[in-house]
Amino acid sequence: MILIAGPCVIESQEMLRKIASELQPLSEDARIDFYFKASFDKANRTSLESYRGPGLEKGLEMLGRIKEEFGYKLLTDIHETQQVAKAAQVVDILQIPAFLCRQTDLIVEAAKSQSIVNIKKGQFMNPADMSHSVLKAIKTRGGSEASYEEAKRLGIWLTERGSSFGYGNLVVDMRSLMIMRQFAPVIFDATHAVQMPGAAGGKSGGDSRFVAPLSRAAAAVGVDGFFTETHVSPKEALSDGPNMITPQALKVLVHQLLALSEI
């Protein structure tokens, strides 16, 4: 089972290391293909005043230290084509943010790297239409069709993170997991699926109570892995605190997901 876990954004080297240390038992489980994640820049924050992160250069340096100390494989998201080359030197997965999932130049540039490309499904997207985004990456890597086998072979993944449900709310249509899994390995991101975009007055809200049940539901439907943002103190997190769960809660959840995956 693939597990991508870590904080929403890089806050400090000390906090990054603290969270990474808490996740070490999960990384050592032979049943888990573990990736540590964190963003160097949250480029689509609701408010101009919201914390965005340390930026590309410093952020990659900080992630590199985590890789060196813990031996973790890494994921970070990119927003512009010129970020790809530098990010690909440090991380193992380049993530295309949901709002940018149709951006051809960004997908193609990411696919030119040696990193896995994880494309997050836009909240506004029909899951079936994500095959076009997948095919952009597949063709860039010399493939010819959007199929699960081809995408897996070429390292192209999709992530489900909920769909817009009116203003300031998201809902998960579990059918999308089956639909998208026809043409790519699928990761389920429950922590962003429980987000309430822009609902907290200049920033997004959320309800982390639903992270575990939605994750278990996705495991029952069938997915290739899970993306879960975690923080030692979600209430004090500088971004997406209401959606995140603690490392302790994540450990409990992962054992449940492993059990469900074996059914």
UniProtKB/Swiss-Prot annotation:
GO MF terms, alphabetically ordered: 3-deoxy-8-phosphooctulonate synthase activity
GO cellular component term of the entry, any: cytoplasm
Pfam families noted in UniProt: DAHP_synth_1
InterPro entries per record: Aldolase_TIM, DAHP1/KDSA, KDO8P_synthase
Reactions this protein catalyses: D-arabinose 5-phosphate + phosphoenolpyruvate + H2O = 3-deoxy-alpha-D-manno-2-octulosonate-8-phosphate + phosphate
EC numbers, comma separated: 2.5.1.55
Gene3D superfamilies in the cross-refs: Aldolase class I (3.20.20.70)
GO biological process, one term: keto-3-deoxy-D-manno-octulosonic acid biosynthetic process
Entry's localization field: Cytoplasm
Family listed: Belongs to the KdsA family.
Protein name, entry field: 2-dehydro-3-deoxyphosphooctonate aldolase
Annotated organism of origin: Wolinella succinogenes (strain ATCC 29543 / DSM 1740 / CCUG 13145 / JCM 31913 / LMG 7466 / NCTC 11488 / FDC 602W) (Vibrio succinogenes)
Gene that produces this protein: kdsA
